[in-house]
């Protein structure tokens, strides 16, 4: 099959917004206008196109959100047909890994702002992420029909609060109830949408006389921004005082792709005004896959490799989201960076080092899904029934393996016990948790050997709340949740030498005999976490028993002698011991090693480590004193403040155990006007009084 849309006509975009800015309505309207102008034809092979939404409503599960394909030829059909893949960006920036991944899958972004609320604290976080990954973007100021809407104020906020070099492409005609349309400053024409057909049709008109001078002023700023793209244009601009429409668009595109400017559009998605003009801006100014640098990865020999957006290169794709569908199983959404793959082909999962067969491949369109036979560079699609693929895995050609995303998932810092409410829930819960863990690699599940409880662990209270909520909504599993438990660690502070461990049972029959002498010493926290050095000389312990000594110690690390928490940052040097020709065995040396380790650990000044979170609070200036006072009561170390006119950002390091319930407390202190984010930072030694209480509580269990 030949390529139907040239890759230069692709736009892989994310729509990202603060909660109240109207992201959902904007996305719906995009699908409405593109879906109406492009009816999906009869699906090849006579397979019926299945109505996806109906199933979704029955199941209460949103599958369409990960990525949707739409087609757009421009408001006036002025372009060749472009293919726009809209990728959902996670609403929650707490999970950096998710935001990071969606930023990798996008080529460009549309930032949606509310014309009343403007730039909110959460908008800053998403903006910083987009800066970090160099994502070109345009802005859409939505809700121009709302009371208090002010387009130019929001444009100014993007400039002052986010540091964006903004260029207004449009001006609104009226605002609030009187918002009737927009002025296109490139064409210098007013656009009015027809309310009778939900804005499907529109007319170009002359600019209202009372707006003419303001439009001319803004147009001059726009042309100057375009002229700065090159010296030739600058000269032409100085001589003629203007540039052609074509020159303006080409120059602005060049500057957007270089990350130098942010074009801004406006409208009201709810009132069906301005969305098509914003789609035109997506085509005019945001990059095709061929406009962005080749994606980098790691080859099999650990050297750096890359893949260009071309069908000719070896196949490489990134699995960026796994959606669970109770009927078809796993849907793995993936972005193809290079090459071509057909349904039925076998690919290589370079992260898990396993082969997978691509069965059915589907693409989502507005509210339909279409089975397709092949995908090519630049495409975004979903595969049904891949068995072992996890979020962030690379799928590639078997003869050209590459890893596109080095996934180093942070270790979970908080755990809770979950208990199914009924026997029926018990069976479903295991399945549900397994599926959710496959989707989200920063979430873990295990069974506590002592209590038999199921323990779930994740990156914070909110993270686990969302998991439990999804378990109830998507899998219909009701469960009781225990109190949050913090994942502490144990380590040592001083070195101890020549500690022996002897396991000897020699009373009749075959005995057991193992004897080791070790040194135990602390390792740097940045290091490997554990090292084992064998310095046995002269065969005092035969070589075949050395791995058993290492294993005996490693088994002790899972549950430390102090309070049963994992032990880290320790090194062991095995340098002496003895054995018995008949009675020595692997088991005997394993037991001897564990005895030596326990004895050495007790003498090596053992300490308890607690997880410290990096906390960032954004609050209006009036509440700074209350917020800092409250953080200090939580044993926080406040590292500094940054103030802008509207918001003060407080950076602090706080023990996780003190952060439970913080969201509620912060809301009540600041009348709901502050927000915070936190992420794991490091482990630090817990104060003696805190450690003593924790150890006591563990022993009482």
Swiss-Prot record:
Positions in coiled-coil regions: none
Keyword Cytoplasm included in the entry's annotation: yes
UniProt-annotated location(s): Cytoplasm
Residues holding GTP: 17-24, 88-92, 142-145
Similarity comment: family membership: Belongs to the TRAFAC class translation factor GTPase superfamily. Classic translation factor GTPase family. EF-G/EF-2 subfamily.
Role of this protein: Catalyzes the GTP-dependent ribosomal translocation step during translation elongation. During this step, the ribosome changes from the pre-translocational (PRE) to the post-translocational (POST) state as the newly formed A-site-bound peptidyl-tRNA and P-site-bound deacylated tRNA move to the P and E sites, respectively. Catalyzes the coordinated movement of the two tRNA molecules, the mRNA and conformational changes in the ribosome.
Protein name, as recorded: Elongation factor G
Source species of the chain: Haemophilus ducreyi (strain 35000HP / ATCC 700724)
Gene name for this UniProt entry: fusA
């Amino acid at each position: 099959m030949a390529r139907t849309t040239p890759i230069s006509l692709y736009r892989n975009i994310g729509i990202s917004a603060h909660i109240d800015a109207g992201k959902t309505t904007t996305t719906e309207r995009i699908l409405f206008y593109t879906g109406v102008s492009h009816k999906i034809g009869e699906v090849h092979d006579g397979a019926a196109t299945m109505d996806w939404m109906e199933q979704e409503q029955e199941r209460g599960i949103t599958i369409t959100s990960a990525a949707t394909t739409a087609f757009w030829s421009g408001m006036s059909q002025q372009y060749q047909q472009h293919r726009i893949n809209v990728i959902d960006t996670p609403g929650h920036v707490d999970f950096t890994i998710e935001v990071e991944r969606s930023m990798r899958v996008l080529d460009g972004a549309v930032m949606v702002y509310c014309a009343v609320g403007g730039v909110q604290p959460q908008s800053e976080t998403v903006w910083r992420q987009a800066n970090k990954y160099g994502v070109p973007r345009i802005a859409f100021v939505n809700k121009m029909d709302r009371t208090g809407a002010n387009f130019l104020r929001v444009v100014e906020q993007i400039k002052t609060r986010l540091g964006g070099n903004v260029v207004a492409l449009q001006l609104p005609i009226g605002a609030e109830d009187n918002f009737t349309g927009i002025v296109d400053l490139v064409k210098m024409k007013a656009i009015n949408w027809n309310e009778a057909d939900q804005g499907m049709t529109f007319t170009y008109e002359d600019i209202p006389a009372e707006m003419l001078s303001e439009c001319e002023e803004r147009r001059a700023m726009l042309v100057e921004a375009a002229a700065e793209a090159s010296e030739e244009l600058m000269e032409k601009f100085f001589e003629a005082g203007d540039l052609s429409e074509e020159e303006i668009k080409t120059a602005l595109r060049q500057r957007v792709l270089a990350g130098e400017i942010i074009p801004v559009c406006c409208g009201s998605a709810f009132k069906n005004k301005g969305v098509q003009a914003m789609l035109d801006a997506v085509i005019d100014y945001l990059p095709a896959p061929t406009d962005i640098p080749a994606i980098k990865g790691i080859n099999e020999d650990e050297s750096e490799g890359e893949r260009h957006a071309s069908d000719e290169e070896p196949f490489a794709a990134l699995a960026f989201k796994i959606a669970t569908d109770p009927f078809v199983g796993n849907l793995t959404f993936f972005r193809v960076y290079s090459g071509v793959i057909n349904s039925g082909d076998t690919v290589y999962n370079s992260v898990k080092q396993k082969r997978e067969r691509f069965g059915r491949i589907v693409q989502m369109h507005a509210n339909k899904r279409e089975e397709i036979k092949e995908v090519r560079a630049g495409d975004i699609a979903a595969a049904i029934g891949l068995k072992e693929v996890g979020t962030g895995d690379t799928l590639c050609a078997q003869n050209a393996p590459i890893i596109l995303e080095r996934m180093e998932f942070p270790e979970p810092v908080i755990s809770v016990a979950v208990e199914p409410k009924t026997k029926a829930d018990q069976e479903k819960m295991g399945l549900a948790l397994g599926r959710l863990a496959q989707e989200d690699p920063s979430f873990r599940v295990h069974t506590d050997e002592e209590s038999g409880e199921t323990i779930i662990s994740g990156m914070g209270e909110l993270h686990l709340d969302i998991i439990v909520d999804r378990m109830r909504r998507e899998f219909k599993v009701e469960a009781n949740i225990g109190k949050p438990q913090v994942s502490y660690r144990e380590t040592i502070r001083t070195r101890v030498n020549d500690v022996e461990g002897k396991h000897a049972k020699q009373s009749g029959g075959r005995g057991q005999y193992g004897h080791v002498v070790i040194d135990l010493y602390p390792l740097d926290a940045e290091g490997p976490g554990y090292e084992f050095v064998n310095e046995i000389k002269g065969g005092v312990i035969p070589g075949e028993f050395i791995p058993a000594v290492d294993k005996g110690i490693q088994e002790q690390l899972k549950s430390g002698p102090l309070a049963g928490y994992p032990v880290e940052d320790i090194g062991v040097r095995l340098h002496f011991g003895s054995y018995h020709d008949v009675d020595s065995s692997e088991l005997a040396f394993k037991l001897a090693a564990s005895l030596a380790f326990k004895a050495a650990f007790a003498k090596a000044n053992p300490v308890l480590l607690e997880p410290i979170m990096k906390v960032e609070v954004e609050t209006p200036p009036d509440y700074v004193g209350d917020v800092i006072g409250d953080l200090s009561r939580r044993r926080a170390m406040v590292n500094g403040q940054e103030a802008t006119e509207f918001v003060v950002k407080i950076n602090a390091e706080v023990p996780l155990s003190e952060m439970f319930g913080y969201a509620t407390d912060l809301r009540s202190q600041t009348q709901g006007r502050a927000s915070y984010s936190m992420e794991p930072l490091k482990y630090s030694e817990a104060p003696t009084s805190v450690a003593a209480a924790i150890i006591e509580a563990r022993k009482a269990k």
